[in-house]
From Swiss-Prot:
Gene Ontology CC terms: ribonucleoprotein complex; ribosome
Protein name from the UniProt record: Large ribosomal subunit protein uL24
InterPro entries, alphabetized: KOW, Rib_uL2_dom2, Ribosomal_uL24, Ribosomal_uL24_CS, Ribosomal_uL24_KOW, Translation_prot_SH3-like_sf
Key words of the record: Ribonucleoprotein, Ribosomal protein, RNA-binding, rRNA-binding
């Protein structure tokens, strides 16, 4: 189970984009797309049905989920995420380093 969710603030910990930060746009099985990182150029054909123009389009490619970590804004470092059950029985995501709850992505 991936502990990184859409909307999380992450930092890249390995690869050519190491040290850069961004917001998660999407999460699949073991890959994540991060806003503004791992940009690739795609040659796109024009499509009359959708109205898409042809040409060279720059877009985000996915990164492996093991190469990113959730960014803890209070410590300004990469952190791990765990789950904690509160007294009401609700599960909340917390940082492993300091036990603070992870901000809910909007």
């Amino acid at each position: 189970m991936a502990k990184i969710k859409k909307g999380d603030q992450v930092i890249v910990i390995a690869g050519k984009e190491k040290g850069k930060q961004g917001t998660v746009l999407s999460v699949s099985e073991d890959r994540v797309k991060v806003e503004g990182l791992n940009l690739v150029k795609k040659h796109q054909k024009p499509n009359r049905v959708t109205g898409a123009e042809g040409g060279i389009v720059t877009q985000e490619a996915s990164l492996h989920i093991s190469n990113v970590a959730v960014f803890n804004a209070t410590t300004q470092k990469a952190d791990r995420v765990g789950y904690q059950v509160d007294e009401n029985g609700a599960k909340t995501r917390v940082y492993k380093s300091n036990g603070e709850s992870v901000a809910v992505a909007k």
